[in-house]
A protein has these predicted regions:
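Short, intrinsically disordered, charge-balanced linker/junction segments flanking boundaries
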Residues: 271-276
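Short, solvent-exposed secondary-structure capping/transition elements
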Residues: 114, 129-144
């Protein structure tokens, strides 16, 4: 890693040392890429992050942008310090912060959701990629993203998610489409697939993981709905029992009142046996 980093520095130094205009221009145009490579080479990649790279099918370039963002897995009690946005469904489980160009990932401990973290890591990697693109590059991608989004139809869950993002920040529509479509949508325009192939050796891996996660959420949602229905049924049963109890109590109270009134009336009971 250190040798590779020094090699990059040496290349830039040689270009400048020669005094050639092309050399200086190369360094200026590739300044961010040089920095990314140096940061990535010096980053001590945790085993978990290395696993995300493999599971999500990232390419060497995708892995570079992920590690250059120095991803950190953050425990739940600390996560809100870095990522504060809310979104429907799964909620926010990661973020790319432009203030320090870093990725923060929520530490998901539920084994049923072990496929989530690679998806979120890839999602945030694409945010890191997006913010490194020029306005011209972003504008060229926007119609492809809108085309892919339009083919999903108005009932697709992504419609609600994007609306929530836009309500929070209207400028977030295209960047979020870029990351979500890249990690969760299987069929995209050929030109867009070719673009994503820069960052994924096999994009179907991350889409498969996303599908698996949403199947888990669908199962959990069904279980919650079943539990809610059972509780509503129990509530109705309890309400029926309460009504029966109150009605029985009312009738009993009326009978007791009538008996007491009759008992206090001389001659109301002709014999002791009738009183008893």
């Amino acid at each position: 890693r250190l040798r590779a980093g020094l090699a990059l520095l040496a290349l830039g130094a040689l270009a400048l040392q020669g005094g050639a205009a092309w050399g200086a221009l190369w360094v200026v145009e590739n300044e961010r890429n040089i920095k990314d490579q140096l940061v990535a080479y010096q980053f001590d990649t945790p085993e978990s992050v290395a696993s995300y790279i493999e599971q999500a099918g990232l390419s060497e370039t995708g892995a570079l942008y992920l590690t250059a963002s120095q991803p950190r897995v953050v425990p739940s009690f600390e996560f809100g310090r870095y990522c504060a946005r809310n979104e429907p469904g799964i909620g926010v489980l990661g973020c790319y912060t432009t203030r320090d160009s870093r990725i923060y990932l929520y530490d998901v401990t539920d084994p049923r959701l072990d496929s989530m973290e690679p998806v979120v890591a890839a999602h945030e990697m694409l945010h890191a990629v997006w913010f490194r693109k020029t306005t011209t590059e972003q504008d060229a991608l926007a119609p492809l993203l809108e085309e892919a989004f339009a083919t999903l139809g108005s009932e697709h869950p992504l419609v609600e998610r994007i609306a929530t993002y836009e309500a929070d920040d209207p400028a977030s529509r295209i960047p979020e489409l870029y990351s979500i479509i890249g990690t969760e949508i299987r069929e995209v325009p050929n030109a867009l697939e070719a673009h994503y192939s820069q960052y994924f050796d096999d994009r179907s891996k991350v889409v498969d993981l996303a599908d698996r996660v949403y199947r888990v959420f669908d199962t959990l949602q069904a279980e919650l709905e079943q539990l809610s229905n059972e509780l509503n049924s129990r509530n109705a049963e309890i309400e029926g029992l309460r009504f029966t109890y109150e009605e029985t109590s009312r009738v009993l109270a009326a009978d007791i009142g009538a008996f007491n009134e009759k008992a206090n009336t001389p001659g109301a009971f002709p014999s002791k046996s009738q009183f008893e």
